[in-house]
């Protein structure tokens, strides 16, 4: 479905992403992890058209999309969420989602957008009440709204950016289960950027790890968690995989 080859992004003399290549298969959930500043968001911004790569290729469903404008990428079947939700507070919950649906698939049909909004809100567990205010949503509700907006665009590939940020343990588990439900029931392929590795590892099919803009590991969650390079990046050279798991458990618990 998605083939990324030799992706590079430079900002002046700083290289944020350096020669990263990977593939994502139809129906897969790929976890993308790494320390702050490792290049995760930069890759998402290039996949979604917000940034133009310095070099490299991004091929989605057989079409080269590197440098394509964001609105065309959305119409082409890639939707994304953002780490920090920024809804339109003058619009209702329903209107926020319908607006995304209106522009997402390029049909500019109000009826189609409203139908997409109803389905997306139902999927994430938010009411389709057309008068409910965005201001009544807490952290978990805003994350659901962000996800519903992305789903309303009708994506074949969903880029989920830190869907667990700011949530408690129960809400984190629910959000992770929601991503798996979206894949299982809607057939949407997902790339998931997340810092809460303990939760991510139980949901994804594969994991890719970045450090300083370079891919340092890729594979099954169990293999990546025991990779010495990954352990060193997260905890230092004297750590082992059990310490990595314990550290991530504490992070997920907010300790």
Locations of regions flagged by a protein language model:
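Glycine-rich phosphate-binding loops of nucleotide-dependent enzymes
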Residues: 1-255
């Amino acid at each position: 479905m998605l083939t990324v080859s030799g992706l590079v992004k430079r900002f002046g003399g700083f290289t944020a992403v350096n020669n990263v290549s990977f593939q994502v298969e139809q129906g897969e959930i790929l976890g993308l992890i790494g320390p702050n500043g490792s290049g995760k968001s930069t890759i998402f911004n290039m996949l979604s058209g917000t940034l133009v790569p310095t070099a490299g290729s991004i091929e989605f469903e057989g079409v080269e999309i590197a440098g394509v404008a964001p609105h065309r990428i959305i119409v082409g079947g890639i939707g994304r969420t953002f780490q920090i939700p920024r809804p339109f507070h003058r619009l209702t919950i329903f209107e926020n989602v319908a607006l995304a649906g209106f522009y997402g698939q390029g049909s500019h049909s109000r009826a189609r957008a409203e139908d997409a909004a109803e389905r997306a809100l139902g999927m994430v567990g938010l009411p389709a009440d057309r008068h409910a205010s965005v201001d009544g949503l807490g952290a978990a509700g805003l994350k659901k709204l962000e996800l519903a907006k992305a789903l309303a665009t009708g994506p074949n590939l969903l880029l989920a950016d830190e869907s667990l940020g700011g949530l408690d343990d129960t809400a984190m588990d629910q959000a992770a289960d929601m991503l798996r439900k979206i894949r299982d029931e809607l057939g949407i392929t997902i790339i998931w950027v997340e810092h809460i590795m303990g939760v991510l590892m139980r949901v994804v099919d594969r994991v890719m790890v970045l450090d300083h803009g370079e891919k340092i590991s890729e594979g099954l969650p169990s293999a990546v968690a025991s990779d010495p390079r990954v352990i060193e990046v997260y905890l230092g050279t004297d750590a082992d995989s059990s310490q990595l798991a314990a550290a991530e458990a504490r992070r997920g618990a907010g300790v």
